[in-house]
């Protein structure tokens, strides 16, 4: 919501408060275990695992905890029967919302997700109801750097697009399959990666007013409080003027 960053509007994130740390760690460990189970324990050869490790480190998870989770995934422990499920629905103001879940019990998950939509004036849709509005992309965030040099490095590495932000940061978009190789190329050119992960980018956005924006944020918060929810994506656009009123 700050500036005109698409990322800030696409994916709302709550601060990792101490009270939330246990739940955040649980979700991160689930993703580490699942990524290692599906793609193996070699971070350099498993982009999903690399992204999960980076996210875990950014949330101050220790290397020992990360390594134990990876070992569980590779070893096929009891908690590796998780499956990824995407739920689609409509939020306040007609916004499109996609909810990425990781769960071993679909009935439990839907019983958490559906009421979140209902309580916030939205409704859970059927598969494909809003998915066509989003594209799966790789996103790399760079906090600062020389724009010309970064653009050259990103293009050379195979990036699709680079977008400078008002705060001096940069958003670099890639084909999701190329995220790892583009990241490596940019790092090799001397730039520090702030974050890199696969995300969902909307093709169109819905601008929200001061009445509707808080309702969407409430929906996102409710969904992110669900244990099985890993990520929430939406196409709501919140202007600086509206954000200042929240």
UniProtKB/Swiss-Prot annotation:
Give the GO cellular component terms, alphabetically: cytosol
Which terms are listed as keywords in the entry?
Cytoplasm, DNA-binding, Transcription, Transcription regulation
Report if keyword Cytoplasm is assigned: yes
Q: Name one GO biological process term.
A: regulation of DNA-templated transcription
Places the protein is found:
Cytoplasm
Which InterPro entries does the protein's record reference? Integrase-like_N, TACO1_YebC-like_2nd/3rd_dom, TACO1_YebC_N, Transcrip_reg_TACO1-like, Transcrip_reg_TACO1-like_dom3, YebC-like
Query: Where does the source fall among the domains of life?
Result: Bacteria
Which Gene Ontology terms cover its molecular function?
DNA binding
What family is this protein classified in?
A: Belongs to the TACO1 family.
Q: What is this protein called?
A: Probable transcriptional regulatory protein APL_1151
State the organism of origin.
Actinobacillus pleuropneumoniae serotype 5b (strain L20)
């Amino acid at each position: 919501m700050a500036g005109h960053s698409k990322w800030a509007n696409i994916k709302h994130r709550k601060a990792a408060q101490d009270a939330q740390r246990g739940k955040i760690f649980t979700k991160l460990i689930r993703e580490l275990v699942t990524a290692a189970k599906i793609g193996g324990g070699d971070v350099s050869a498993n982009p999903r695992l690399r992204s999960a490790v980076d996210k875990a480190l950014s949330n101050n998870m220790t290397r020992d905890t990360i390594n134990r989770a990876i070992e569980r995934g590779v070893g096929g422990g009891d908690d590796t029967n998780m499956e990824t499920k995407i739920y689609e629905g409509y939020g306040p103001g007609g916004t499109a919302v996609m909810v990425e879940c990781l769960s071993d019990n679909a009935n439990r998950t839907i019983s958490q997700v559906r009421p979140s939509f209902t309580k916030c004036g939205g409704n859970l849709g059927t598969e494909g109801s809003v998915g066509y509005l989003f594209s799966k992309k790789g996103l790399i965030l760079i906090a600062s750097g020389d724009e010309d040099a970064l653009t050259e490095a990103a293009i050379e590495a195979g990036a699709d697009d680079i977008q400078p932000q008002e705060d001096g940061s940069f958003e670099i978009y890639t084909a999701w399959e190329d995220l790892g190789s583009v990241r490596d190329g940019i790092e090799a050119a001397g730039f520090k990666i702030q974050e890199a992960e696969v995300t969902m980018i909307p093709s169109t956005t819905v601008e929200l007013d001061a009445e509707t924006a808080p309702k969407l944020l409430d929906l996102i918060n409710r969904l992110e409080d669900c244990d099985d929810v890993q990520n929430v994506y939406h196409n709501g656009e919140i202007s600086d003027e509206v954000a200042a009123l929240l």
